[in-house]
Amino acid sequence: MSHSFIVGEDLFGFADTNWELVKRKRGELVDNAVAKGGNGEYMPDSEVSYNERQDITLVYRAKVKDAALAVALSLGLADPTSGYIPISIKANTKIPGHAEIEITGHKHGTGTHEVNSIDVSCTVDGWGATDFCSATADDGCQSGSWTATIEHSDKLSRAGDFFAGRSQACKIEVSGQYISDTAPALAADLTDDGSDIQEGDDFWTASLKAHKYLTP
């Protein structure tokens, strides 16, 4: 079965010698509003559709097993060809498995976004689990994720169409799972979001979450 629909859909220019585009999801979204009558009933003739927009998610998979692959993207900066604005990027890693990168974005048919963006980056191992949480990489790490999300605000015109938007604050969230009965020490630049310790029928596992903030 052919999957040629992916060709030419690398909208954020992320595919290269290390990363292959393997999945794409595109959605057409619209909001609707309808008035209610005095008895709480809907009045169908009043229904209005507004704020049409398109969302997209692209997934890339590492096609090499090399360690410390660079992952970098400018969140909030629209692709000049497609018009899509990336608002989040997530790295998922586990053992066994090759790393995957997921990028989500959106665009509108009208209006303009302010050109304010922030560069985000991390490094991942092409194969196996990357430890994004620990001060020193823990060999017992079984899975790790890293997510960068830029806060995005859209405003509508008086008729309900998209009018203007801007991106601003950026948050980095990380998580990891470890073969251990204690959570590892966090990297110095991270703030602890909590941990869970679980006893299984074979090994203890520790799960850890943390975050930090970036300024555009």
Which residue stretches match the model-derived regions?
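Viral virion structural and adsorption modules
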Residues: M1-H3, H211-P216
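Solvent-exposed edge beta-strands and adjacent loop segments
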Residues: M1-K63, L77-H106, T110-S207
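Extended intrinsically disordered, low-complexity coil regions enriched in Ser, Thr, Gly, Ala
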Residues: A68-A72
